[in-house]
Regions:
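Catalytic machinery of carbohydrate-active enzymes
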Residues: 1-143
C-alpha cells in the first residue's frame, strides 16, 4: 500500500537538492532511519526536534508549521497543519476522485497540489516541486 501511495525517500532528491534550504522533519513517527539515509546518501541534514512531541503537542507543532517558509509533503497529517496555519504547502499526490480533494477546502488556500497517475513514477512530481520552490525561494521570509 505505501509504495503505491507514498514515494520512497530516494524520490525526494530533487527537493533535497535545492541549494540554501533548511529542512525540518514534521513527521510524528520515528523516521530516524530515513533521516539518516538522507544524510548519508545526499549529505543533507533534516532537522528533527527531539524535545517536540509531534504526536501530542499539536499547538507547538502548529507553531512550528507557521514558522516555516514552505512545506513539502504527501497527503499526510502535517499537510493539514501547514495548510491550516497558512504556510504555503506543496503536496505530492496521486490523482484521485474530487470528493476528497483538499483543494475544495477553503482552509487550504495555501496548497499547491502536484499530482501523478497512481502507477507513474514520482520523479516528475518532485522535479516540478523543486522547480516551483526554486522560483519562489528568494521571496521567503528568512531571519
Amino acid at each position: 500500500y505505501r509504495l503505491k501511495h507514498y514515494p520512497p525517500i530516494s524520490e525526494w532528491s530533487p527537493v533535497f537538492s535545492i541549494p540554501n534550504v533548511t529542512f525540518i522533519n514534521l513527521q510524528y513517527k520515528d523516521f530516524a532511519d530515513d533521516l539518516a539515509k538522507i544524510k548519508d546518501d545526499l549529505g543533507i541534514t533534516v532537522h528533527h526536534f527531539e524535545d517536540l512531541n509531534q504526536y501530542d503537542d499539536i499547538d507547538d507543532v502548529a507553531a512550528l508549521c507557521n514558522a516555516l517558509d514552505i512545506a513539502v509533503t504527501t497527503k499526510v497529517t502535517p499537510m493539514i497543519l501547514t495548510s491550516a496555519v497558512g504556510t504555503p504547502t506543496k503536496i505530492a499526490n496521486w490523482q484521485q476522485s474530487t470528493w476528497n480533494n483538499i483543494l475544495t477546502n477553503p482552509v487550504s488556500s495555501s496548497v499547491d497540489m502536484f499530482e501523478k497517475n497512481t502507477w507513474e513514477p514520482w520523479n516528475k512530481i518532485f522535479n516540478l516541486i523543486a522547480q516551483d520552490i526554486s522560483k519562489q525561494k528568494d521571496s521567503f521570509n528568512h531571519f
